Design a protein with these regions (language model features):
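Hydrophobic face of amphipathic alpha-helices that form TPR/SEL1-like repeat modules
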Residues: 94-101, 134-143, 173-180, 207-216, ...
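Short helix-capping/linker turns of helical repeat alpha-solenoids
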Residues: 72, 86-89, 101-103, 121-124, ...
Length: 282
């Protein structure tokens, strides 16, 4: 029986392929062609490994975004800029979100520019980044950010695009636009529709706004039981407005509740607690 020959470490990979080519009896032209093919495969594989190694994860992008937003950390800023300039929609959105509320006007302008770029990105791969950018830019234009002037029409367009593709936070802000008539005619039905979508994602502020709609019959049929359930769910997330509304309902006997002094005082204490630990907005 012939002994099994094991390949030495030096004969693995590209080096092994080259040695095998040298041992094969081929005409010179065929040998050169085979060698060129081997080199091309090796270069392609190395390039793939390099690209893969340089592609950051979503968690890494989030970390760099936080570092830039909090302290304009130079390394994180440089990495996001490199990736954004190379066409990464995710990096463009992360950099834009990090810089749009920066202290320096130049950085704020840069942030808005990256958000505009990311918001217009096309293709399935860029869709999540486009939604993030549309939400961030739409929110900034609706509420105001730094020296960026409010632009309700542009905000409605951006938030509408994001909401239509399933972004619950964008749906909430779109509901605010239609409820109060920011840059458009107030539309209680549209407001309730978008608050409902955001509420399904259990956004406490959306629960509260939808509860108000059911309580008042604004855009939806009046339904105090539904309103009470939504207020309670928002209060469970310590939304101060919801906790305070429940307290007043117990005091005055509203929303189908009987007056209850003990429940009122308990809710009032919860209101004070909730105000010390406000819920972060969507």
């Amino acid at each position: 029986m012939q002994p099994i020959r094991t390949m030495r470490p030096a004969e693995t990979g590209f080096a092994a392929a080259a040695r095998r080519l040298l041992r094969v009896k081929l005409p010179p032209a065929a040998l050169l062609a085979a060698a060129a093919a081997t080199v091309a495969i090796a270069v392609a594989a190395a390039g793939w490994r390099s690209t893969t190694a340089l592609t950051p994860s979503a968690a890494q992008l989030d970390e760099w975004q936080a570092m830039v937003a909090q302290a304009a950390e130079p390394h994180a800023l440089a990495r996001l800029r490199d990736l954004a300039r190379a066409g990464s929609g995710a990096a463009q959105a992360a950099l834009g979100i990090a810089l749009v509320a920066a202290r320096e006007p130049g950085l704020r302008d840069e942030g808005r520019g990256w958000l505009e770029t990311a918001a217009q990105a096309q293709g399935a791969d860029n869709a999540p980044a486009a939604r993030r950018a549309q939400l961030a830019l739409g929110k900034a234009l609706l509420l105001g950010s730094g020296d960026m002037p409010k632009d309700y029409a542009r905000a409605r367009a951006l938030l509408g695009a994001a909401a239509e593709h399933g972004d619950a936070a964008a749906a909430y802000y779109l509901g605010l636009i239609y409820r109060s008539g920011y840059g458009t005619a107030a539309d209680p039905v549209q407001a309730a529709h978008w608050f409902e979508i955001a509420s399904q994602a259990e956004i406490p502020a959306a629960d509260f706004m939808l509860a108000n709609a059911y309580r008042d019959g604004s855009g939806v049929p009046r339904d105090e039981a539904r309103a009470l359930a939504l207020y309670r769910r928002a209060a469970e997330h310590e939304l101060p407005e919801a906790v305070q509304t429940l307290a007043m309902a117990y005091r005055n006997g509203e929303l189908g509740l009987r007056p209850d002094a003990d429940a009122f005082h308990a809710q009032w204490i919860e209101t004070a607690h909730a105000l010390k630990h406000p819920v972060v907005g969507p």
